[in-house]
Structure formats: C-alpha cells, structure tokens
Amino acid sequence: MNYTVLVTGSAYGTQNASTAFLFCQSLIKMSHILNSVFFYCDGVLNANNFNKPSVDEFDLLSAWKQLNEKNKVKLYVCVSAASRRGVIEDEKISNTKIKNGNFASFFQSSGLLELAYSIKISDRIIQF
C-alpha cells in the first residue's frame, strides 16, 4: 500500500511527531511505500534546525534526517505554516534582519498543493 503521513504536532511537547516517525519506520519495515511525510500546523516545528534535545532524549530531528537519507522519503514542510512559526529558510530571510535561517536542509518547503498530490497518489493518509 502507498501511504502519506501528515504530522501536525511539534517535535517536543506532544507524542504526535515521535509516533509518526515510529509509524513511518514500521511502514518501511513492512515493505509498504511511504510516498512522503507532510508537516503542517505545529508539525512544521520538526524542521527547526535549532531543536537540540539533551543527551538523554531522543533526537527526532536526526531521526527524520536519517529516514530521508536512508530511505529517500520526501519530507515536505508547509512554507506558510513554517514562516508563521518562525521556521525560515536561508533564502527567505533577505528582507528580514535575521542572518541565518533555522530550516533544516533535508526538509523541502512546499505548499498544500504537494499535500493534495501526495493524497491523490496514496491509498491511505495517516495524521498524527
């Protein structure tokens, strides 16, 4: 089966994102196709490169990166939701006083059109 995962919970403070990550890993282990993971609402905070947990906590940002690199899973972030929550790409900060963005490079900024396309080609969409 083809899946799209929609993450609407932040990296820390709720279990939405960590549960979504574990679900994605299970899909891959069970030989399902994971088309993409789309981060929306507070889920865009998963793409904040400044997320640094303490040494005894699970590093969800690194886990998403490994999922992307090892399994070629596309990680889409809603650019509008991200900018409203202060997650900004380097290329988008030219008209601000900020020197560097905090958008992790292995995520891709996109709009809701990408989510709609992912839903269209998937058998299932699962929201966390």
Curated annotation (Swiss-Prot):
Domain of life per record: Bacteria
Top EC class of this enzyme: transferase
Single annotated GO MF: sulfurtransferase activity
Subcellular localization: Cytoplasm
InterPro entries xref list: DsrEFH-like, Sulphur_relay_DsrE/F-like, Sulphur_relay_TusD/DsrE
Active site: 78
GO-annotated biological processes: tRNA wobble position uridine thiolation
Keywords: Cytoplasm, Transferase, tRNA processing
Cellular component GO terms, alphabetical: sulfurtransferase complex
Major location (coarse): cytoplasm
A UniProt-annotated Pfam family: DsrE
Subunit structure as annotated in this protein's UniProt entry: Heterohexamer, formed by a dimer of trimers. The hexameric TusBCD complex contains 2 copies each of TusB, TusC and TusD. The TusBCD complex interacts with TusE.
Function according to Swiss-Prot or TrEMBL: Part of a sulfur-relay system required for 2-thiolation of 5-methylaminomethyl-2-thiouridine (mnm(5)s(2)U) at tRNA wobble positions. Accepts sulfur from TusA and transfers it in turn to TusE.
Family per similarity comment: Belongs to the DsrE/TusD family.
Protein name: Sulfurtransferase TusD
Species in which this protein is naturally found: Buchnera aphidicola subsp. Schizaphis graminum (strain Sg)
Gene: tusD
